[in-house]
Structure formats: structure tokens, C-alpha cells
Amino acid sequence: MAVSSSNPTQTRTYVLDTSVLLADPASMSRFAEHEVVIPIVVINELEAKRHHPELGYFAREALRFLDDLRVRHGRLDQPVPIGEGTIRVELNHSDPAVLPAGLRSGDNDSRILTVAQNLAAEGRDVVLVSKDLPMRLKAASLGLNAEEYRAGMVIESGWTGMAELQVTDDDLRMLFEHGTIELAEARDLPCHTGLRLLSTRGSALGRVTPDKSVRLVRGDREVFGLRGRSAEQRIALDLLMDPEIGIVSIGGRAGTGKSALALCAGLEAVLERRQHRKIIVFRPLYAVGGQELGYLPGTENDKMGPWAQAVYDTLGAVTSPEVIEEVLDRGMLEVLPLTHIRGRSLHDAFVIVDEAQSLERGVLLTVLSRIGSNSRVVLTHDVAQRDNLRVGRHDGVVAVVEKLKGHPLFAHITLTRSERSPIAALVTEMLQDITI
């Protein structure tokens, strides 16, 4: 069941909003023996989203799911069986008089709240289910039970991609001499976990390999002129430059160097090693407030400015203007919003998905499914800066990390030390316990 019940013997009425169906088109079948109600305005919203570049696929899948039920049962305005429960599209219960004046705005959220409140007024045990944080807050202000849709969410383990092991002096000597050693303590760690190896006489950095041995990570490695300043950054560079790892996830607070590391690794792979043809940086629309490109003034290049500028700012901090000009003139760098990824196959490219914390899980999986031959993808993210309120703290990129950790094609590292400036370090430290 998607949502837990405090009284499992009582049938509850779950009113779903559009965000739930976009996150999981099959969500309607995940409520066990309970009643599922879809307000008619949700169908209208799904129709409006059918051609959305990021969410259109999920809107169409949800509509197909409902249409299959219609074909099977003839009509949906009356409850029809689904699993052990029922589902219906609600055409009535639309009188807004049950709402306080401040919520009678006539928008779609108000219409969904009207349905839920009218059903509750009839004595039903109503729960409004939404991925949208403001929607849940509005429902709670009416005294309605409101819950986040949790099916498919994972329990975050807190895995940072790093571990610390105590080793003998002989172990450390063998690691420096041969480059790899066998450590029993490392065999239970996920593949590609970064290691701080400590002995009485020194320390070293290492990484768990797919065969569970430990490989030395050199601290003096330079990638396109950039050297890691912290243990985590050095491990990150080692992961980024390993062509056998197809997906690298880099998490961390503002100023920890996520984007700089990813861009330098891309420049090294494309310009120096010729491993890929180009760098493609995707940024979600939510990175600058969520506006659609069409609503912004100016030409397409003008509209792209806010998305591209953050990438160029980072490039300017790690390389010279001449290199940036060369990369752009040779068409070796593209900065695109994720609206451009649907229908593309990304071959022979070093792909960076920036601000990945703002992507819903379905959109993120769509991105990863577009990675073609001889391509790699880097996800940079900071879950403390989610601009998309439909993405919870434990879904999206967090779910991907938890599901993929330990696979030889995947690696994750969380950066903890701010390298941007003393001001950024201060803000990161002071605000690290504030969560959304």
C-alpha cells in the first residue's frame, strides 16, 4: 500500500492530486482495499501536461491507465474495482462553500481541496495525497489529513560513499608498493566506496574495486589543472576519471566543488584524452525558478542565459577564457535545459546533470535511459536546495543513489567541505541542519 493507515480495519478515501499521477502513473492501484478518488480537474491537468517536455510521458501513461479502466468497466464516474479497493473519477462534490474565503481562488488546487473537504463533510475518512508540499499545507490548514505519496520511496541510509578503516603498517606499505591490497573489512562495503586508511605511521586513500580488493588513490592526481583539496574531492576525481564507471553521483552542500570537479573531468576526457566528442550539461528548469522557456523574454539564446551562466561561471573559475572560447567554437560544450532531452540518444558524450536534486524520479530515470554508447553521466546535487517542491527528501536522486549503490557501473561520493570561500563555508556550516 502506498500510504499507511492508522486504522487498517477502516476503509479510507484517498483523494489523489495531479502530482501523484505524474510521479507514478500506476499509483492508483497501490492503495490496497481503500477507495481512490480522482477529481475531474486532475484529468484536465493531465490533459494539459500531455505534451510537456519533461512530464508529458507520465501524463500520457496516467491517462492510458485510466482509459484501460474505462474500456474494462464502461464508465468511471461510479466506483470500479481496482485491486482490493475501488477507484472513481469524481464529477460532483464541487461546491466551494465548504472552503474558507481565502481558499476560494478558483484554481485547480482549490477545486481538489473542495472535493476532499466535501467528501470529509459526509463523514468519510478522507486523506489528501500529494507530492506537492504547498498542497499538503493547504489541506492541513483545513483540518484534512494530508500525506505525501510514499510508494517507491527509499529509506535513506546516510551513505556518503566514504568509510574509514584502521589498517596495519604492513598493509599500508603493501598498498603503496603494489597499488592494491586485500582487506577483509572492505569486502562488506559497496563497490567504489572511498576509503581513508589509517595506521600508526601514516594514512592513505583507497577505493573498493568491483572484485572487493582495495586500490590506492593518489592524492596528487591532477585533472585539467585541478587537484582535490580534500579526501572526498580526491576520491571524486578518481571516480570521475575511471571510464569503467558509467554513472557518478556527487552530492554536497553549496561551494563544495561538485560542478567544478565534474566540468574539469569532462574537459580532461574531451580535450586531453579524446575519450568523448563533447560535454553536454543539462540543468532543470527549476534551477532558476521553474519558468517555462517560452514565457521568458527575448530570443532562444536570451532565454537560455540564466541556465547557461552558472556553468560558464564555474568554467571561468577553473580554466582560462581562451580554453572556454576554444571549447565553444569547436562545439564541444552544450548547456541545455532538460526539456531538450526527450527523444534524444546521447552518444559519445560526457553528460553532466546539474542540480539533479530538483528532478522527480521519473524524469531522472528518463535522463539516465538516454545515455548511449561511449557516454558517461555525472549527477551533481544538493538535497538541501530542492527548488521543485514535488520532490521529497527521500525520492528523486536520493532514491537513485540508494538503489544503484554497490553496482560496478555506479559510484557516489558526498563532499563535505566548502571550497568556494570563507563566506560560503560559514553559510554552509551555519545552515547545515536546516531541512526542507
From Swiss-Prot:
Reaction catalysis annotation: n ATP + n H2O + wound RNA = n ADP + n phosphate + unwound RNA; ATP + H2O = ADP + phosphate + H(+); GTP + H2O = GDP + phosphate + H(+)
Which InterPro entries does the record cross-reference, listed alphabetically? P-loop_NTPase, PhoH, PhoH2-like, PIN-like_dom_sf, PIN_dom
Q: Name one GO cellular component term.
A: cytosol
Altering residue 342 to A: what's the impact?
No longer unwinds or cleaves 5'-tailed RNA, decreased ATPase activity
S-S pairs: none
Gene Ontology MF, one:
metal ion binding
EC identifiers of the protein: 3.1.-.-, 5.6.2.5
At the top level of its lineage, which domain of life is listed? Bacteria
Keyword Isomerase part of the UniProt annotation = yes
Pfam entry (one) = PIN_4
List UniProt keywords, sorted A-Z. ATP-binding, GTP-binding, Hydrolase, Isomerase, Magnesium, Metal-binding, Nuclease, Nucleotide-binding
SMART domains with a match to the protein in the record? PINc
Q: Which residues form the PINc domain?
A: 12-137
| Function in brief | Unwinds and/or cleaves 5'-tailed RNA in vitro, the reaction is maximal with hydrolyzable ATP; double-stranded (ds)RNA and dsDNA are not unwound. Unlike the protein in mycobacteria there does not seem to be an antitoxin gene upstream, suggesting this is not a toxin-antitoxin system. Has ATPase and GTPase activities.
The UniProt family comment states:
In the N-terminal section; belongs to the PINc/VapC protein family. In the C-terminal section; belongs to the PhoH family.
Any notes on this protein's domains? Has an N-terminal PINc domain and a C-terminal PhoH domain, suggesting it has RNase and nucleotide hydrolysis activities.
The UniProt entry, under PANTHER family, shows: PIN DOMAIN-CONTAINING PROTEIN, PROTEIN PHOH
* Name used for this protein in its record: Protein PhoH2
Q: What is the lineage of its organism?
A: Bacteria, Bacillati, Actinomycetota, Actinomycetes, Streptosporangiales
